[in-house]
Amino acid sequence: LIHLSFVLKPTRNREKTEKVNLQGTLNALSAAEASKAKQFIYFSSTTIYGAYPDNPIWLNENSLIRPKSRFQYAVDKAKSEFLIEKFASNNRSLKILILRGCPVMGPNANNFISRAFQKPLLIGLRNYDPPMQFIHEDDVVNLMEFAMLNEISGTYNIAGEGTITWSEMAKLIRAKMISLPAFLLSLLTEISWQTRIQSESNSSGLDFIKYRWTASTQKLKETLNYQFIHSSHSAWQTFCDKKT
């Protein structure tokens, strides 16, 4: 059983969204138990590590889980992992696989990053240009198939090889970008969120284009001997090719 259902975009009704996300995870686990499924696959997120100035260059699966408290998507992903681990302790026969993925990119991408680059003017943070990771949508599908056929279990970070910076992304997609001071952009983002001018994110989302939050995929390579077809750069390029 593969659990992918999740509220991706932030909402202003945090309690309701949390209930949908966490109850959805519990329902999926119950379905796996009732159907006597052999394997449960959960698509988590590298955002659960949080974007912080003291992050190491590469975050591994044993790094601290510290999602930004106001970035609900990451908070609920981390809470869902906890529910799954608790369930696993009482259901030893079920193979549980947790995939902590970076943003999925490709021709059909629809996430907070892809939407930012579809706007007439791209906003950047002055003096900040962190490396980003992406995984191509085809690589996600291929990995799921590999995991099911081989009944893989455990927790793995997944991301395309290498990184690409925010400014490099803007050049590839030929976006007009303006860089604002961090304090000003944070203020404008928070005001526009509170006044409902925009519904993408409160100011906590800006940390993900301010600080590094790159995840190591060494465990995936060494334990499973698995390699993705697309790098982070080429995954982004396929999105650009579709949009330009």
Question: For each of these PLM feature ranges, what is it?
Answer:
Residues 26-72:
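Conserved Rossmann-fold NAD(P)-dependent oxidoreductase catalytic core, especially the SDR/UDP-sugar
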